[in-house]
Amino acid sequence: MHRRVEWMTPTDDAILSLLGPPKQLELRSGDIARNTGYSRRRISDRCTVLVDRGLLFRDDEAGHPYYGLTDFGERYVAGELTVDNLEKA
């Protein structure tokens, strides 16, 4: 997909690809896990990192967190960011 920085993993690319264009989904970690083949725990851990780095947002509606791409995340998926942009995130 894209060139990753040191803190990123293949799981991150799977999450970002699933949530990104053309679908622009907002999903819970369990739904992301079912669609990517990674464990729910792994997805939850990586979503936390991606939220902290500004690539995902977390919506805690009714106590069930949903994740979706931020504008920064959309730019990453579109290939508009450099590795330097991500290293500073």
From Swiss-Prot:
Entries under Gene3D superfamilies matching the protein: Winged helix-like DNA-binding domain superfamily/Winged helix DNA-binding domain (1.10.10.10)
InterPro entries in UniProt: WH-like_DNA-bd_sf, WH_DNA-bd_sf
Stimuli inducing this protein: Expressed in the lysogenic host.
SUPFAM superfamilies membership: Winged helix' DNA-binding domain
Keywords: DNA-binding, Repressor, Transcription, Transcription regulation
DNA-binding region(s), chain positions: 29-52
Protein purpose: Transcriptional repressor expressed under lysogenic conditions, which specifically binds the host DNA site 'RRGAAG'. The binding occurs cooperatively, probably as 2 copies of a dimer. Possibly prevents RNA polymerase access to the promoters for lytic cell cycle transcription.
Protein name: Repressor protein
Organism: Halobacterium phage phiH (Bacteriophage phi-H)
